[in-house]
């Protein structure tokens, strides 16, 4: 068994390769939900959906969000009616949000709702929300404290971040299913997702760090050189007091990681780390990196 910690970008590219080189029933993915949001009365879980759509074979891999060849008739009509839907939601994608929202309103746990949706999509992997507790990442800006989606989508990441804040009514806890997946795994891989808004929220959930203590943990940096492959990781890391580099990423995961992987293009050597080509520009590159990570995990286990 192998468990990944994942956001919605970076790690799914690695998962694209991993599903080709290992038994898909042996893969568990614990997914960030701190970017979840209710829009137009429906529940969007963007990172969970990206992972689910990837495994279902319907992900739009041009954008790494949404469903391939989706239409946007409803979104366009909502805008025509003067409503402020600032996230462009496809029609099939919206159907998933409607279904999830209905299940949550009926009292279903997010974990169970996700399992139901994955079954409908024929997903064989074990896709797990990080928690059934509602958690939200907000960023402090000149506009005040705003939801991460408002910062990244509505404001296009163009406003200065002063701080990153996690908000929840009660302290978030890892679900029993998450703990079981980690405990059953031979290795845990912290994927190359945003350390601040994708991975840290998972690690902040009660129980998961303790479950990972006795596991072999591999972390993959999201930086190519000193630049993140995608998204606002650099600005978010600086606002959180970390250097926006692979070294800064390693500092985020201090005392948790057994092996840190950074890119061959990284200008700085790191102690107790190895270099691999982590720029996954296509499926073959994703497969190559996945095979190398599996080999490292097997070597450590031997």
Swiss-Prot record:
Catalytic activity: (2S)-lactyl-2-diphospho-5'-guanosine + 7,8-didemethyl-8-hydroxy-5-deazariboflavin = oxidized coenzyme F420-0 + GMP + H(+)
Disulfide topology: none
EC number: 2.7.8.28
UniProt pathway: Cofactor biosynthesis; coenzyme F420 biosynthesis
Residues that bind 7,8-didemethyl-8-hydroxy-5-deazariboflavin: 49
GO molecular function: LPPG:FO 2-phospho-L-lactate transferase activity; magnesium ion binding
Role: Catalyzes the transfer of the 2-phospholactate moiety from (2S)-lactyl-2-diphospho-5'-guanosine to 7,8-didemethyl-8-hydroxy-5-deazariboflavin (FO) with the formation of oxidized coenzyme F420-0 and GMP.
Protein name (Swiss-Prot/TrEMBL): 2-phospho-L-lactate transferase
Organism of origin: Methanoregula boonei (strain DSM 21154 / JCM 14090 / 6A8)
Gene it is expressed from: cofD
């Amino acid at each position: 068994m192998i468990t990944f910690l994942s956001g919605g970008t970076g790690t799914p590219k690695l998962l694209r390769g991993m599903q080709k080189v290992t038994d898909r029933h042996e893969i568990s993915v614990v997914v960030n939900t701190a970017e979840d949001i209710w829009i137009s009365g429906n529940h969007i879980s963007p990172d969970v959906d990206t992972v689910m759509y990837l495994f279902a074979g319907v992900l739009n891999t041009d954008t790494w969000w949404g469903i391939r060849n989706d239409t946007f008739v409803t979104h366009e009509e909502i805008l025509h009616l003067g409503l402020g839907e600032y996230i462009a939601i496809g029609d099939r994608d919206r159907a998933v949000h409607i279904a999830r929202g209905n299940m949550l309103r009926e009292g279903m746990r997010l974990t169970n709702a996700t399992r139901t949706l994955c079954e409908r999509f024929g997903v064989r992997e074990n896709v797990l929300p990080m928690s059934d507790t509602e958690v939200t990442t907000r960023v402090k800006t000149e506009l005040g404290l705003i939801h991460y989606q408002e910062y990244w989508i509505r404001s296009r990441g163009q406003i200065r971040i002063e701080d990153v804040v996690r908000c929840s009514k009660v302290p978030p806890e890892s679900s029993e299913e998450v703990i079981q997946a980690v405990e059953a795994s031979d290795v845990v891989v912290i994927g190359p997702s945003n350390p601040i808004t994708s991975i840290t929220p998972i690690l902040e959930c009660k129980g998961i760090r303790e479950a990972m203590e006795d596991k072999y943990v591999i972390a993959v940096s999201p930086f190519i050189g000193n630049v993140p492959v995608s998204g606002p990781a650099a600005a978010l890391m600086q606002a959180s007091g970390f250097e926006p580099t692979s070294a800064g990423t390693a500092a985020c995961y201090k005392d948790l990681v057994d092996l840190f992987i950074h890119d061959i293009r990284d200008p700085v050597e790191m102690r107790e780390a190895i270099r691999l080509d982590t720029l996954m520009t296509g499926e073959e590159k994703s497969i190559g990196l996945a095979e190398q990570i599996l080999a490292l995990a097997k070597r450590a286990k031997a």
